[in-house]
Regions:
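Proteins with a high burden of low-complexity, intrinsically disordered sequence enriched in S/T/G/P/A and R
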Residues: 1-3, 72, 189, 202
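ALDH superfamily catalytic-core signature
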Residues: 2, 8-157, 180, 220
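Short catalytic-loop micro-motif centered on adjacent basic/acidic residues
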Residues: 2-5, 195-197
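Conserved C-terminal structural/oligomerization subdomain of aldehyde/semialdehyde dehydrogenase
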Residues: 37, 87-93, 120, 140-265
């Protein structure tokens, strides 16, 4: 009666088209290029650890992963955050994924690894720089593993392809915005509206952010706005396609409705 799908927006659009052609319902999750905004009043230590996990957890291979990290504030604050984040990323232990002492495992396949390497090259061609390079990482005892180390790109701007498209790997882009307004404009201007997060101690900034960003999942001092249990989950625009969307629509997708009109004599 219907199709549910999670993957790239290109495939989701094709499946949506086919579902409509044959009169089937469709629920689709597409690509993402998620942003996290770090305000100058954020708890830096906790923010760094949250964003480290939000970026490099699952080796960055999840639609909820944070890809673009934007600091809002002075140049001094941006440099302080950048240095702290790079140090945290550098401390990640990469290795065999079932080893409990390991923080980050390999890419899922050679094709995925090569795709991430291509995106890094695209970023360099666009004018970004590498502040932490994980391309040549070697893991002892696993010479043929599809490993990449944590990578941090700096001098990134929102018009670059590496900021607009989904990298799907352990690459973090660091950007600097002049204001929260500008940061929100960058998020809403992206073609993918899956998830976004803000780190701040200000309730006013948090409320403004969650109200104005056009994404399906919002985190406030949470890097991964991941649904737990029966929480809804969704995206907007090219990140969330189909007839059904989060909350009540989720169970309606799996339910057939019937209207019965009765008269007793």
């Amino acid at each position: 009666e219907g199709t549910a799908f999670v993957g790239t927006s290109t495939v989701a659009l094709k499946l949506y088209e086919l579902s409509a052609k044959y009169g089937k319902r469709f629920l689709g999750g597409g690509s993402a290029s998620n942003y996290a905004i770090v305000m100058s009043d954020a708890n830096l230590e906790k923010t760094i650890m949250s964003l480290r996990d939000a970026k490099y957890g699952n080796t960055g291979q999840r639609c909820l992963a944070i890809q673009n990290i934007v600091t809002v504030g002075s140049d001094e604050f941006h440099e302080k955050f950048k240095n702290a984040f790079i140090n945290a990323a550098r401390g990640i232990k990469v290795g065999y994924g079932l080893d409990e002492s390991v923080d980050m495992g390999p890419m899922a396949s050679l094709r995925y690894k090569e795709n991430v390497l291509k995106w890094i090259e695209v970023g360099l061609e666009e004018g970004a720089k590498i502040a932490l390079d994980g391309r040549n990482l070697k893991v002892e005892d696993y010479p043929y593993g599809f490993y990449l180390g944590p990578t941090v790109m700096v001098d990134v701007t929102p018009d670059m392809k590496i900021a607009k498209e989904e990298i799907f790997g352990p690459v973090a882009n660091l950007l600097k915005a002049e204001s929260l307004d500008q940061a929100i404009e960058w998020i809403n201007g992206n073609k993918y509206h899956h998830s976004a997060a803000i780190f701040t101690s200000s309730g006013r900034w948090a409320r403004e952010f969650k109200t104005r960003v056009k994404v399906g999942n919002v985190g406030i001092n949470i890097g991964i706005a991941a649904p737990m249990g029966w929480f809804p989950f969704g995206g907007r625009s090219l990140s969330g396609l189909g007839d059904f969307h989060p909350q009540i629509d989720t169970w309606q997708f799996f339910t057939d409705k019937k209207i019965t009109i009765v008269r007793w004599w």
